[in-house]
Amino acid sequence: MTLGRDAMTPLTILSVSETIYHNLLTSMVQDIVSRTTSRQQLQDARYPGLAPLHHDQRGALDVYGRPKPQEASVYFRCPNCSRDLSANRFAAHLERCMSRGARRG
């Protein structure tokens, strides 16, 4: 009879599969940690003074920690029909406008 990790535990399919699973998980976690650490060290070497992005729970500040602009009169021109649209409606208009053009042709 062959023994497992402990001298008292007999080698079974369950014990072998648990050992393989444990080794696989450990290897995956170590790989992820190693890659993340390497990326962070490379980023720190390339950009030594890089400040992390700011996260505001209230939503009043942008990712750089500055107050969000309250100007709602930002307009974009539709490349399909050349209409000027407000920024908050641009994506919805573009979806409708582009699908309308595809149906015509």
From Swiss-Prot:
One of its GO terms (molecular function) is zinc ion binding. Gene3D superfamilies: 1.10.287.210, Classic Zinc Finger. Keywords: Activator, Chromatin regulator, Metal-binding, Nucleus, Transcription, Transcription regulation, Zinc, Zinc-finger. It is found in: Nucleus. GO terms for cellular component: DUBm complex; SAGA complex; SLIK (SAGA-like) complex. Pfam families: Sgf11, Sgf11_N. It comes from the Eukaryota. InterPro entries: SAGA_su_Sgf11, Sgf11_N. Disulfide bonds: none annotated. Its main location: nucleus. A zinc finger (SGF11-type) spans 76-97. GO terms for biological process: chromatin organization; regulation of transcription by RNA polymerase II. Belongs to the SGF11 family. Functions as a component of the transcription regulatory histone acetylation (HAT) complex SAGA. At the promoters, SAGA is required for recruitment of the basal transcription machinery. It influences RNA polymerase II transcriptional activity through different activities such as TBP interaction and promoter selectivity, interaction with transcription activators, and chromatin modification through histone acetylation and deubiquitination. SAGA acetylates nucleosomal histone H3 to some extent (to form H3K9ac, H3K14ac, H3K18ac and H3K23ac). Component of the 1.8 MDa SAGA transcription coactivator-HAT complex. SAGA is built of 5 distinct domains with specialized functions. Within the SAGA complex, SUS1, SGF11, SGF73 and UBP8 form an additional subcomplex of SAGA called the DUB module (deubiquitination module). Interacts directly with SGF73, SUS1 and UBP8. The long N-terminal helix forms part of the 'assembly lobe' of the SAGA deubiquitination module. HAMAP family: Sgf11. This is SAGA-associated factor 11.
